[in-house]
């Protein structure tokens, strides 16, 4: 399969710059992958497509305010530091990306402050890639105080394609209501559509709500740089699947109930046949890393349905959706979505493939 097959024209005005007023009021396109039938409803109506003991798998990662704007200590030059992951909480050491990279070298000190007078100084201690650096924050106070100040200084890492300033609303809306375990720098966007009320309605209907953790990284928005998809290697992400969750999902499979992956981060994680899932489609508890990359054609052995968004051309998420629903069908329904003016991107509308 070639990357260029996933190119299509997306009118700029269909990229949602802001979320819908209410989480569960977005539009929902329902796609029956066996027949190709398409229905158009509101997201909160998704409950009508599931029955008692059908099982949802959510990603409970929490997005950190990863984008810091500061200055070089001596020159005052503006810099941006993007937090990727914490390496050593005791030493306050992080793996980061910096911009402008050519002007930020080992030994440089960076200064960050905000309108609330939160301040912190950091020192570059190593290089990792052309833009990658290892940074140590120079803070001697309690760890919780450090994290509070750091996150107060940071902005939510909304994707660059939104091409707008971060707002206070993003702090809440670029986060699922069930976010629990911090570590992501990309929101599990399919989950953004779930409200507290909708989650409660699913529980009352008898659906099983299960949670895994996938700390989604910048690789989700990194451009695929090869035409031959077999040559592409995705970035690794840290995942956690506990025993309780694995047991519930395996029971659903054994009882032939629907298993719905909420988002592509969940979908690819539970298809990791090296670490997570057996050849029969049963999950093992696992804590570690995965770099599973999925594109058509692919035989899924765990999920029976998928909730996802409308993704941008040539994106890794689009490849996964096309693998799940079938390439021809998904590219056709994307044409229908554009004609019907569905909203694309992380704050856009949703799709259910069943």
Swiss-Prot record:
The keyword Transferase applies. Keywords: Cytoplasm, Queuosine biosynthesis, S-adenosyl-L-methionine, Transferase. Belongs to the QueA family. InterPro entries: QueA, QueA_dom1, QueA_dom2, QueA_sf. The keyword Secreted does not apply. Its main location: cytoplasm. The gene is queA. Pathway: tRNA modification; tRNA-queuosine biosynthesis. Monomer. One of its GO terms (cellular component) is cytoplasm. It comes from Azobacteroides pseudotrichonymphae genomovar. CFP2. It is found in: Cytoplasm. This is S-adenosylmethionine:tRNA ribosyltransferase-isomerase.
